Structures are given as C-alpha cells and as structure tokens.
C-alpha cells in the first residue's frame, strides 16, 4: 500500500507526459492529506468546443474524502483503494459507480522492504525515467469545511506474484501494488465507463521498474497538514 510518494511538480514534465498544467502551491513529497496534483478528464470536454482540453490537472488531498464525510481527517485512511472491494466500500463506491477516474502523476513511490527484518524505505520508479501515471479515483466534499475540497485515492491490486512488489511489506502481509498505467491507456482510463474499469486493474511489468533503498526517507521530518475539521 502506498502512503508516500513524490509528485510530479515540474511544469515541463507534467505538460510533456500528462498534457496538463501544474496546479499552484504543490509540494513534491506527498503523505496522506497533503495536496497533490491529479489529472482528470475535463468536465467540459463533450460540449463541442475544440478549445477545451482533453484533460485538466487539479489539486486535491491525498486520501479520498467522500461527499458525506464531516471531517477532512477522514482521508488519512483512504489514500489507497483495493480494486477487489472498491465497488462495495462506502468510502469509495460512489466515486467508482460514477467512474470518477483520475491519474496520479508520481516521479516515484515508496514502500517498506522488510527482507532484512526491519523496514527499509525503498524508492520505486520507472526504469526509463518517465513519471508514473497511477490509476485513481477522485471526489469532492463541501460538508467538512463549507467549501469544495477535492481529494483522490490510488487503486491497488494483489502483488503476491509480482517479481518486484512481492518484496515489500511484512512477510505475513498480503503484497499489494498501485495500478500503474501505460501512457497509451491514459485517455482510455479517464473516459472509461464503470463497466470497463476492472479491465485496467493489471500489474505493471517488474522489468520496467527499478528500486533503490532510501533509508533517509524514513528519518526525514515531515509536517502533517492540519485539517480544518
């Protein structure tokens, strides 16, 4: 399960790989409830105006905050959504039902490697140097603050048999990985109806990824965002 990653904040890389502009005020190191960019299909794409782009980047809290949640802190436990149960869980089922698909641009993600007997923060990224496009769901909430707050979650799948992700988390735990999309899937995912959503829940090949231990990541001080509620 991914609770920490580095967002794509470089304007040129966001434009080149995701065809969107970077939202203002975004930091690179992301933890639950931090604001980070996510990409969604432009809501006015189908109005017939060719000037409307296919995608837009939004700033949202990492951790889906459903419309009925009364506190932003709800997102501390909803930063990942299991693809096997996403249609049933109250936190996610509305976003899944209405196919509120998004892509989370990430330079790399972090997972704990327990093979030495203790957790070693490990950076995982694409071998070709391109950023990851992680499949997610987005939502909006007005109840918590009275103002519209956007948020998102990353979708995950089983990785017990994945040559790379099977190495992470405690030995007795189920192995999970985020759903990393190919570039040629981006628009298909953003526009897919709910009936086709499961087709995208596939493992990204281990041969196209690299990992490296980053022990300092675990010792770095981070400032937790303070939710308004």
Enumerate the language-model features and the residues they cover.
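Short linear sequence motif anchored by a di-proline
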Residues: 1-229
């Amino acid at each position: 399960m991914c609770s920490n990653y580095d967002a794509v904040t470089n304007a040129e890389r966001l434009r080149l790989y995701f065809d969107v502009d970077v939202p203002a005020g975004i930091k690179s190191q992301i933890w639950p409830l931090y604001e980070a960019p996510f990409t969604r299909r432009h809501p006015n794409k189908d109005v017939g105006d060719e000037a409307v782009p296919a995608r837009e980047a939004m700033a949202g809290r990492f951790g889906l905050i459903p419309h009925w949640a009364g506190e932003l802190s709800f997102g501390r436990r909803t930063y990942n959504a299991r693809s096997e149960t996403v249609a049933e869980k109250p936190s996610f089922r509305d976003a899944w039902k209405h196919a509120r698909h998004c892509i989370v641009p990430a330079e790399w993600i972090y997972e704990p490697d327990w093979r030495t007997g203790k957790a070693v923060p490990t950076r995982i990224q694409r071998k070709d140097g391109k950023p990851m496009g992680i499949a997610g769901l987005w939502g909006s909430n007005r109840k918590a603050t009275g103002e519209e707050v956007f948020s998102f979650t990353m979708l995950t799948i089983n990785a017990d048999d994945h040559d790379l992700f099977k190495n992470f988390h405690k030995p007795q735990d189920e192995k999970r990985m985020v759903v990393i999309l190919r570039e040629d899937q981006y628009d298909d995912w953003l526009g897919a109806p709910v009936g086709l959503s499961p087709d995208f829940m596939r493992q990204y090949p281990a041969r196209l990824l690299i990992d490296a231990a980053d022990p300092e990541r675990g010792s770095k001080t981070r400032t937790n965002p303070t939710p308004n509620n």
